[in-house]
Amino acid sequence: MNKKLIVTICIALLAAITVITTKLLQNNGIVLNTSTIYTMLTLTILLAICLLNTTIRTKLQHVCCDLDWAEVTSKFYNNIPEIYRKSFWITFGLINVAFLFHTINFMWGGDDWGAVRYATKLKDGLSEGRFSAYWLQELLFNGKILPVINNLWTFAGLALAGILLAYYWNLPKKTSTYVVISLFFAVTPYTLSWLYYAKNTLGNLWLPAFVLSSLILSEKKSENINKSYFYNILAILLCIIALGTYLPIVSFIAIAVIGKVIMGLITSEKTFIQTLQEFTQSLSNLLASFMLFAFIITILQEKSIMANAYNTQLESIFAIFAKLPQMLYSMIEQLILPMPFLDIAYKFFYIIIILTALFTIIFKCNTPKNALTSILLLVLALVCTKLTYLFSIQSLSNPNYVARIDFYSLPLFYTLMLSIVLKLSNPTQYKYTFIFAILIVFMSFVRVAYAQKVWKFGWDAETKLVDRIITRLEKIPEFNINKQYKLVQVGEQSLRKNYYVKRNNEYQSNELLNSAYYKEGKGKEAYNFYYQTDFIKEDASNHAFNDPQIKEYILHNARAWPAKESLAIINDYIIIILNEDRLAQIRATLNR
């Protein structure tokens, strides 16, 4: 019989065995999600192909049976230069200290109740075009959000990103420099904004490490053409994963590349064109990544899998030009605009770093032409901090200043400025700049600690509020613990604000302060979370207000919590009124 036919039959049999085994497991109550089934099937087929190929089978046997993996791992680790190993562990430890309170208390945000109780799924981000948003969570923890270890893995990614950033920008190879640069980037309230979204924390905070790895691999050269292909394919894959997780990462990519170009200009006499020619492969890989990403998005849209979400739907060319003046204004204003835990004094220290970097370039750059080019590139980097605002469709979810989006731009821009000063400094200036950077890092630690305190108090207060709501619900005669209700929650109570000392003219941030843990329209998973039964089957839509009895109650009887009339059970609906202003809005709509 033909050898290829035998191989095909064997693979088909193995695939059939996998499918049958999966069915048997499901019939016996062991439920496997779709991604797990596909993974098992793919691995089975790959294993079959490998085992049937003599060359591959021999190599696998050597890898599995002959190698001492403890020795191989130890050798690989020891081959990493000590400065990188030492810097990573110091940075990793200090980042964990900065966010220790959050890690210990295992907090999450108002969008995470279902994901924490059950797990994230690979398909969850597809409707927004975020096709790789949860793959890392799925790979490491089978989609589950776990206490302590989730944050540890997240901060490992942040620490790695800091080390890779210092390496990519070719900063002085000192442990102190690498650690300070890493902390300068990683420990800020912008980072904390992603910890409000527990289901996104791991995937999104690893993106800088993926992007920097991609850029470094793109520059890696090898005499072995197969290795070169491997490096470039891996670089493109990492970039696609980053884009498919969260598109605003384009700001990070742009600023990182601009920073690399600037570092080349300020330390040599090469022209801008000569410096740019060194990035041919990197730019080619980035272009390939964007094209493949666009191709995937097109397929998702054509198959009606993806909706036009704000983070992937682009503005028209006319709208972009119309937004340019506001974008340029926002680009400057963001440097001085106070936000929760980002007060004006804190931002003033960053402005000092920016001005110092500009003067350092002017007086220390090798040639006046390169100095001018570098300053123009810094302006371009500042423009890139607002790419998401400029190109994406404007919505309530995408105002001018969003802390979680700014995480991919502003901290990196500030770090670029510090890196320029450290790169061009003489020993005396280096020492004073280093001390000043440590002062800013300390201020960041203080603000992050304060934010975590405010978050914990708000979390406890909102949870106790919901306890009181449920206790009162149970006393309503119509309440039946075994019945399934639809929830109508009018408004929400974000109580983090009660523990925060607000300053004048402060721009509000949802993830840092304003968003509630028990959100309007997303109460099902939250209210079921601590209760003995899943008494809420779904969050009711606005169509619920068309019900005559509910409409009558809203217009004439309802009052905001803690009034007795703030709770009602009407047929299959539980109605909770938490905010007077929101109640007034709904009444105005119903009276039209």
Language model region names:
Residues 31-35, 46, 69, 73-127, ...:
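Intrinsically disordered, polar/acidic, low-complexity terminal segments
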Residues 34-37, 126, 130, 154, ...:
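Membrane-interface micro-motifs in multi-pass membrane enzymes
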Residues 163, 344-372:
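Hydrophobic, aromatic-rich transmembrane alpha-helices
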Residues 217-241, 269-276, 431-435:
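Short hydrophobic alpha-helices at membrane interfaces in multi-pass membrane enzymes
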Residues 229-232, 423-448:
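Signature aromatic-anchored transmembrane alpha helix within multi-pass, membrane-resident enzymes
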Residues 230-247, 252-258:
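Membrane-interface alpha helices of multi-pass inner-membrane proteins
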Residues 252-287:
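Perimembrane helix-loop-helix junctions
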Residues 279-352:
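Membrane-lumen/periplasm interface segments of specific transmembrane helices
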